[in-house]
């Protein structure tokens, strides 16, 4: 059974792009949820879902935030460590 990866990203975020490119280079598909500082531009999620994410993960202040099978692993560096 393959793992489900979710990447919470922000526009013009170099670390977010690095994480997504890293996943692609490993042949891993992922779901992206893009959070904008102003009005949330969310792919496949509602504003309430994004608000719930922020409330449940108050220490997740940087982007990207990466989840594997629903569990937050952290950002790009943690993703790279996990997959190497």
Question: What feature does the model see in each segment?
Answer:
Residues 67-84:
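Non-catalytic, surface beta->alpha helical segment in thiol-disulfide oxidoreductase systems
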Residues 28, 58, 81-84:
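A generic structural signal for secondary-structure junctions
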Residues 1-33:
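Local sequence-structure signature of Cys/Sec-based thiol-disulfide redox active-site neighborhoods
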Residues 35-60:
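Thioredoxin-like thiol-disulfide oxidoreductase module
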Residues 63:
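Conserved nucleotide-sensing/catalytic segment adjacent to the nucleotide-binding pocket
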């Amino acid at each position: 059974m393959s793992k489900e990866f979710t990447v919470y990203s922000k526009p013009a975020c170099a670390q977010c792009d690095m994480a997504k490119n890293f996943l692609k280079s490993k042949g891993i598909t992922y779901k992206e949820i893009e959070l904008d500082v102003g009005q949330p531009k969310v792919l496949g999620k509602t504003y309430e879902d994004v608000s719930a994410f922020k409330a449940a993960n108050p220490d997740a202040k940087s982007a990207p935030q990466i989840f594997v099978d629903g569990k937050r692993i952290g950002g790009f560096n943690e993703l790279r460590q996990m997959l190497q």
